């Protein structure tokens, strides 16, 4: 048991094209239905693909036969495909923390089909809401001529993936109980004292 942590050094070009570029200037606005803010630059997409391959190359030697791999968010959509190409056979899950865009918006993305096809290398894909899962399913039905079963097994691109809705958030009752506890009150007082006369943002 335990957690193994590995760091990946990225070149400034990778940070600019992958993270600041494709992830946050292309996918993030597009997935939040802001086509007006979406930047389409070829170098961004190339950096996104290159950096995800790099992540897969670093992760692959660390994977044990019984490991389950869980990948999070739009920054790493192609990573399961890249791991599979390196011979990884483990179960791989993915959870998207953002909305999934309507098909009419997603098709504005150059190589949108390649991005969605890469998701079919996961074994399980999770969405926050039924609406976002439905938008994903609709894209696959129309753009990839895929089939969707009532239990959200989706077949397309010669592969199949199980999808589901898994809303996440904080334990509100537990959070409120902690706030109202003696320790919570002491913590609040300590934080308030340390913030005295300071601007908080």
Model region roles, listed by residue range:
Residues 1-201:
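Catalytic cores of carbohydrate-active enzymes across secretory and cytosolic contexts
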């Amino acid at each position: 048991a335990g957690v193994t942590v590995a760091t990946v050094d990225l070149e400034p070009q990778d940070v600019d094209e992958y993270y600041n570029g494709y992830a946050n200037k292309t996918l993030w606005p597009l997935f939040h239905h802001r086509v007006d803010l979406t930047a389409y630059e070829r170098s961004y997409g190339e950096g996104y693909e290159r950096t995800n391959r790099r992540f897969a190359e670093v992760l692959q030697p660390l994977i044990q036969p019984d490991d389950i791999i869980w990948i999070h968010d739009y920054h790493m959509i192609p990573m399961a495909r890249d791991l599979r190409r390196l011979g990884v056979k483990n179960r791989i899950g993915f959870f998207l923390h953002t909305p999934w865009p309507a098909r009419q918006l997603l098709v504005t993305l150059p190589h949108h089909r390649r991005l969605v096809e890469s998701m079919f290398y996961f074994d399980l894909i999770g969405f926050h809401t039924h609406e976002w899962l439905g938008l994903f399913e609709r894209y696959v039905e129309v753009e990839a001529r895929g089939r969707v079963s009532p239990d959200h097994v989706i077949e397309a691109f010669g592969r199949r993936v199980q999808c589901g809705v898994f809303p996440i958030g904080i334990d509100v009752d537990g959070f409120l109980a902690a706030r109202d506890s003696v320790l919570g009150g002491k913590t609040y007082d300590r934080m308030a004292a340390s913030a005295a006369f300071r601007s908080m943002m």
